[in-house]
């Protein structure tokens, strides 16, 4: 038996081994999860990479993302092959399909809190709901460490530890890397002309620091909510990032930009930026957010 807790929202889960009896004294508010966990409804896309690393794709029967929304080849192929079915997005799940699949657990992200009635309805149907928060971690290694959480759920603790240890070993040389003195901005431009940037405590900001650069918006704080990003007026973004040595465009929000000219066409102010003039502009692939186990 293992009791798992997600402190941010007070959720607790009692993992009961296969064949074991459920204790009679389980406190109210503790969700019982009986192993083996099967026929999962996976809504949180950042979790899929962890399941792939644990060789647990076959535990997932339902997806909250259509095949074309997956940038992980194995996940997309599983949907195209019919091994995983689309069961509706977080705000509009197909309850009938989920019940028919004998779903053992719904793994959501915090978007579900925008439609709490959906979470309540799933639970009324007897489907436990886990709201994962790996994307709120302040560093990439902490985000990867959630693999231990899922290793416990799936009865693959030893494998999860091995996978995590390998990743930690890969990252170790970066932790002692000296600063290059260079600065970097990570952003996207929204349709309503705002710059979406990561807050200073976000894992992406930490990745930039690990690579030896200074994140130009490191001083942006929580601002009263738990979101890892915030929108800035273009003039504020201009003031903070114009002199950055490198720009990294986040394609996972507004789509891929293939050339610097395309980027400047989205936001003409960028033509004045040092990184644009020096040819130091990059764009992350749309798979970036889903590749939780990569660095």
Residue ranges and their predicted role:
Residues 204-226, 248-251, 283:
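His/Asp/Glu-enriched short active-site or ligand-binding loop at hydrolase and phosphoryl-transfer sites
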Residues 5-99, 105-112:
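A short, structured surface patch at a secondary-structure boundary
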Residues 137-162, 243-295:
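Structured C-terminal subdomain patch of bacterial secreted/periplasmic proteins
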């Amino acid at each position: 038996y293992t009791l798992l807790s997600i402190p941010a929202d007070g959720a607790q889960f009692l993992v009961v081994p296969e064949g074991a009896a459920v204790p009679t004294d389980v406190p109210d508010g503790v969700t019982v999860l009986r192993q083996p966990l099967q026929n999962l409804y996976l809504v949180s896309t950042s979790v899929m990479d962890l399941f792939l690393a644990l060789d647990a794709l076959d535990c997932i029967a339902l997806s909250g993302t259509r095949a074309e929304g997956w940038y992980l080849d194995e996940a997309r192929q599983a949907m195209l092959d019919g091994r995983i079915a689309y069961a509706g997005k977080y705000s509009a799940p197909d309850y009938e399909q989920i019940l028919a699949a004998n779903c053992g657990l719904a793994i959501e992200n915090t978007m579900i809190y925008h439609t709490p009635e959906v979470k309540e309805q799933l639970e009324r149907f007897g489907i436990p709901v886990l709201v994962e928060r790996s994307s709120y971690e302040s560093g990439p290694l902490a985000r990867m460490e959630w693999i231990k959480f899922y290793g416990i759920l799936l009865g693959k603790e030893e494998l999860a530890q091995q996978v995590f240890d390998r990743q930690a070993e890969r990252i170790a040389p970066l932790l002692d890397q000296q600063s290059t003195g260079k600065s970097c901005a990570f952003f996207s431009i929204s349709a309503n002309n705002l710059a979406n940037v990561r807050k200073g405590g976000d894992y992406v900001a930490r990745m930039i620091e690990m690579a030896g650069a200074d994140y130009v918006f490191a001083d942006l704080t929580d601002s009263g909510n738990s979101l890892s990003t915030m929108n800035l007026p273009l003039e504020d973004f201009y003031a903070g990032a114009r002199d950055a040595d490198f720009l990294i465009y986040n394609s996972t929000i507004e789509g891929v930009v293939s050339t610097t000219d395309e980027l400047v066409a989205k936001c003409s102010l960028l033509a004045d930026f040092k990184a644009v003039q020096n040819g130091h502009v990059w764009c992350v692939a749309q798979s970036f957010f889903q590749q939780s186990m990569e660095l």
